[in-house]
Amino acid sequence: MLVNENVLDLIGNTPLVDVSNLSPNPRVRLLAKLENQNPFGSVKDRIAKSMIERAEKNGKLLPGQRIMEPSSGNTGIALAAIAQIKGYPITILMPDNVSIERRQMLAVFGAEIIVTPGAEGSNGAVKRAEAMALQNPDWCFLHQYENESNPIAHYETTGPEIWRDCPEVTHFVAGLGTTGTLMGVGKYLKEKNKDVKIIAVEPPIGERVEGLRNLDDGYIPPVFEKWHGRNILDRKRVVRPRESIECTRRLVRECGIFAGISSGASLAGALKVASEVDVAENGQAVIVFIVCDGGWKYLSTGAYTDDLDVAEAAAEKIIYF
């Protein structure tokens, strides 16, 4: 039996699961990449490990130094868990209207939590963190939105895993947040096969879908610009909050995958692509989409059991990305 040195060795190498029973096109195969199987519960485990370990190697993060990061959830949880294992104190800035489970998980992992006004969204938390970084130059501000260790983590792990397990992939679908997943995986897959299509899922301008942002809402992550995102993305698909919740419920009901709401958005985007793709006779398209995290952090939102109208209204009041 393989014995791992510690839990950090379990980050990555997540499974692909065939969910083609959801496909609207019999010639389009749907595969879900289960990032909820990472030890701290989300795709952000990858970038948290990458950012901390690279900061250690380049001398930006020293023993006992405080880490600071704005995050409304998954990145903060993963950073807090790894920081606790490695002995770093950590401060997480987050909007005051995130789901209660996220605050609870940060507390479990020993993070200091500073809340920012929910009306300012995640952008407000980022601005506050930038100001605090200037006031506390001895802290290590990792800044996932501009840290190249974010897309590098996906270029070095997520992309190669997908290619290893499914070299016949024709489309890759993921949500737009920091854009790290799309940049890293997209660059890797296109280097392997220039014809692979990279599709971003985003909410409508001014609307919230857990884990996602619209690039036209006024903030373009520096990671997207540094990695020439417009050359990597082939198209974007808009997914509304209601569609995200409906598809999140389908994942549970029809596939037994208990996932977060942004995973439902990824599925909704994949279904749109599956409906549009032109598959040659006797051919097949293979769409891989990201299941970003598990559903346990969203139970208090009622996304899985409440009336759909009620769940949609509740989700729109909560900041997730």
Segments from the language model and where they lie:
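PLP-dependent amino-acid enzyme catalytic core
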Residues: 1-321
